[in-house]
Amino acid sequence: MLQIQSPPATVVSRTTIQPALLSVLNKVLSLGAEVDDERGNRTKELRNVTVTVEKPWIWNLDNLVWGKIMFRPKWADREFMKAYELQASATTRNGHPYVYGTELRAHPTLAYVGDDKDDSRVFQRGHAVDQISEYIVPKLVENLRTRRAVGFTWNVAEFSDLKATEVPCLDMIQVLARPDKSGTERLHITGVLRSNEMYSAWAADVALILELQEDIIGKVHATPGYRGPPLGCGLITTVSGSAHIYEENWEDAGHLLMNMGMG
């Protein structure tokens, strides 16, 4: 069987989240290569997929036409999304293997304590760092043009372990404050994901990043001594190393595209 050779990179840029979602679903289904993941799940996959939503605060997914689709993603339920978005401000895991807000706001540091007998370096956990309040916000207050306002969810000591079974998909964010064409200062966020299920998870990821975006803007404005201009929400961009759709969702994703006139 001849295997589809997917493009080395894919770029999608749309004004709002609905056309961005439909476009990337169409590209994964039509151009994606069939790949069995490490758990044995068959997927259609595109690598190195960049999706930009220019006005992510416009949540226009409520008017999607589902019809008789068997599986509706959880992000289609606004009550679920209200609870999911709370992840962005969480500081504890509450029994989950990871929580994005917690990994950003209570990120454990590692302290070098010496060498072991076999000359391997030994580390122990240090204090937890709130990367939002202790670093990203102060960095932006110090200089709005910084390129160093980054945060990580991937805790090396825990997740870079061959025995780890559940690890974050969203691994890094970068925040950039830049003016738009009208001169209005906007806070843009790019999220880097190692793995991104585009049908069932991508829209929820954007919503969570939007919560972070709004929180960071609020904290910058509330910082004593901030003398910069007011910030508005800007672009949200996701960069997905593996953008995929599971085989069990191929048919439903295809029906959604047809229902929306893209089939």
Q: What are these regions, as identified by a protein language model?
A:
Residues M1-G263:
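Terminal, non-catalytic protein-protein interaction segments that mediate quaternary/complex assembly
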